[in-house]
Structure formats: structure tokens, C-alpha cells
């Protein structure tokens, strides 16, 4: 089994070659990680034209011998009735898909539900916590996969909410290399080779290129750590904790380039998303009124119409380094999403600094947020 995926949009469409080996790795990896068997029913509510639908939900069900239930679209109002009707034990997701389920009023069919696991990729840390709190004992199995680089990470235990976990057995070896986010290149040591990151240090994720791995749209980088190696660079920045678990910091194109240096957006979004009052959060850069650089801005939606307290907001963002905090957090009615429920930042970025509505501004002296401008 092999196929070609077209991702992106406009003039930036990318062709991704999914070989039989790549499909099998994802399919059998999912089946193993989720312990899928003939007693399971996988409910694929994700768009099947998305890699997660083809490789994870459908592939995992086939490899694990589980039943597969397909939906024409995701509808929170009928979701739990369908779960009961089909005996669903596994639910697939992409990005913020289950947000609408969490925001929906409690459903009688939700009580003592049969779902034991939500599997997918891209779930924000705040939403992850809401899912496990509301739908316990169901857990979240979060994957990260580069489409062609064979880098596959999985958070098997689910204990570290927001972590992408560790490399899936059988997938390519991965390393983090020091990366100059300003110059956009790897940092080399005195010997001319790339430098592997220390624990807690952010770097670019590399996947070792496999020999005879089929057609690749990305040319491997050769001679990075020694003269004979070959690696495929992702566009993703991670750090690794003391236990060996990987945490996504940002995608290189999404970095916010301020006068104080580059600022990753994911830590801002995670800090805001963990607030009970926040449903969705995005961080992005807009042109600075004072120069050619950017300033960090965040947009949030309320959870259940709750009011956001400036003190609580300040405490949440106080965990970030001072130069990485957004200068303004503004409340919006909703945040646009793609067909597979990924949050869109383009329109917000194009709009520039927010001109009205509820806003919280950073006091550069105190480090606190208040509603004054």
C-alpha cells in the first residue's frame, strides 16, 4: 500500500510520498501503542484526506484487527449516540477537533461511556487536560509524525500532558541539533559538525535518513554529526526533558521575531490554554509600531463564557521568560480553523495589533497584565 498526499495550499502545495513502509510503520505503531484488538471499534471522525486519518485511525484499525466506524462529519450533538450505537472504544482526532465536544453541554449518553482512548496529533495541552478531566477514564494518545522523514514520537503514558513523548519503536532515530533561529541554520562546532542539544535546550528535530527508503521530496543533509551520516531536517523546534521526552516549542515559520530575539509561540499558547477560563489560544507576531521587527500577541476565546481575571492571566504567563511574554492578550469571539481543525493565525496576523474589544496589556515594569492600554 502506497499513496501520495498533497498538503498545503495556494502556491505552496507539497507532495508527500507515503511508501508502504511508512504506512506500515504508522499503522502497526498505532495498533501497538493503543493496544488495538478485535474487541475495539475505532471511530474515525477525522477527515480521511488528512495524514492522521489515513495513517493512524484507518491504518491502526486495519493493522490491529479492530472494527472501523466512519462519520460523514463531526457533530457533537450526535457524537455520543453514535458512540453507543457502534460500540466505539477509540476516537481519532486532529488538532482541536474535540474542543466542540468539550464545550458542548453534558449529554446523558456521555455517562459511563465506552471510550477508552482518544488518538491523534496536534491537541493543545489545555484541551488535552479538559478532555481527560471530563471524559475520564478515557486517556489521550498523542502522536507527532513528520510526513516523510519517518520521525514518529508518541506519548504512551499520557502522564505528561502536552509532551510528544519518545520515538516510536521501529521509527527512525531522532536527534535535536542546535539551531540559529535568526540566521535559519544549524550551529556548527569547531570541527564543522552539528552540535547535539543538551537536556532542556531547544533545537531542530532531525530524523536519520534510511537507506532504500523510497522516493523522498526532501533531500537529506549529509555529514552532520560525522562524515558518513544523513539526516532529514524537520521545520520543528523541540526540547527534551531529563526523562527523554520531547516537547514541541514551535514550527520555524511560526517563530515570532522580536527586537529581543525569536519567541516561540507554543509555550505561550500552552500557558494560556491551561487556564480554565480559556477555550482556545493562539500566539503570533505582528509588525511593531516602533520598527521593522515584531511584537508577540495572543488571542484567546472564553470557555463557557467565563470572565478572564488579570491576576490569573499574569500568573499563567509569569512562568515564561520576560522577553517571551505577549505584549497584549485579546479576547475574540472565535478563532478560524482549517478543515482538519488546525487553528489559523493568518487573518489575526494580518489585522495587526488589536484595535478594540477586551484586551490585557503587559506592564513592562511590573510584568503583570491589566485591562488598561
Where is each model-derived feature located?
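Acidic/polar alpha-helix N-cap and adjacent early helical turns
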Residues: 336, 350-373
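Short hydrophobic/charged patches on amphipathic alpha-helices used for structural packing
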Residues: 77-80, 107, 269
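AMP-binding/adenylate-forming catalytic core of the ANL superfamily
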Residues: 91, 145, 203, 207, ...
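Gly/Ser/Thr-rich phosphate-binding loop
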Residues: 63, 85-93, 102-180
Amino acid at each position: 500500500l502506497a499513496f501520495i498526499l498533497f498538503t498545503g495550499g495556494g502556491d505552496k502545495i507539497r507532495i508527500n510520498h507515503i511508501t508502504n513502509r511508512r504506512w506500515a510503520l504508522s499503522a502497526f505503531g498505532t495498533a501497538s501503542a493503543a493496544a488495538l484488538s478485535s474487541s475495539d471499534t475505532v471511530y474515525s471522525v477525522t477527515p480521511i484526506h488528512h495524514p492522521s486519518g489515513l495513517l493512524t485511525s484507518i491504518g491502526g484499525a486495519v493493522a490491529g484487527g479492530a472494527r472501523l466506524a466512519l462519520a460523514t462529519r463531526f457533530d457533537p450533538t450526535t457524537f455520543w449516540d453514535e458512540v453507543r450505537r457502534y460500540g466505539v472504544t477509540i476516537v481519532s482526532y486532529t488538532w482541536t477537533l474535540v474542543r466542540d465536544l468539550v464545550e458542548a453541554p453534558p449529554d446523558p449518553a456521555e455517562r459511563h461511556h465506552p471510550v477508552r482512548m482518544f488518538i491523534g496529533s496536534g491537541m493543545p495541552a489545555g484541551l488535552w487536560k479538559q478532555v481527560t478531566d471530563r471524559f475520564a477514564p478515557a486517556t489521550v494518545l498523542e502522536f507527532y509524525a513528520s510526513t516523510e522523514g519517518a520521525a514518529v514520537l508518541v506519548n504512551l503514558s499520557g502522564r505528561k500532558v502536552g509532551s510528544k513523548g519518545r520515538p516510536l519503536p521501529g521509527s527512525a532515530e531522532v536527534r535535536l541539533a542546535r539551531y540559529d533561529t535568526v540566521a535559519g541554520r544549524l550551529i556548527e562546532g569547531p570541527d564543522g559538525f552539528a552540535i547535539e542539544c543538551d537536556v532542556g535546550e531547544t533545537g531542530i528535530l532531525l530524523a536519520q535518513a534510511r537507506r532504500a527508503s523510497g522516493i523522498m521530496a526532501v533531500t537529506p543533509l549529509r555529514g552532520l554529526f560525522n562524515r558518513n551520516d544523513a539526516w532529514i531536517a524537520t521545520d520543528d523546534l523541540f526540547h527534551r526533558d531529563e526523562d527523554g521526552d520531547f516537547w514541541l516549542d514551535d514550527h520555524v515559520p511560526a517563530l515570532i521575531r522580536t527586537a529581543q530575539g525569536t519567541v516561540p509561540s507554543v509555550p505561550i499558547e500552552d500557558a494560556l490554554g491551561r487556564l480554565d477560563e480559556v477555550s482556545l489560544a493562539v500566539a503570533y507576531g505582528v509588525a511593531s509600531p516602533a520598527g521593522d521587527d515584531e511584537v508577540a500577541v495572543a488571542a484567546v476565546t472564553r470557555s463557557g463564557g467565563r470572565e478572564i481575571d488579570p491576576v490569573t492571566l499574569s500568573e499563567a504567563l509569569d512562568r515564561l521568560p520576560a522577553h517571551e511574554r505577549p505584549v497584549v492578550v485579546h479576547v475574540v469571539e472565535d478563532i478560524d480553523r482549517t478543515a482538519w481543525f488546525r487553528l489559523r493565525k493568518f487573518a489575526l496576523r494580518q489585522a495587526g495589533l488589536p484595535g478594540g474589544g477586551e484586551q490585557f496589556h503587559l506592564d513592562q515594569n511590573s510584568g503583570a497584565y491589566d485591562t488598561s492600554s
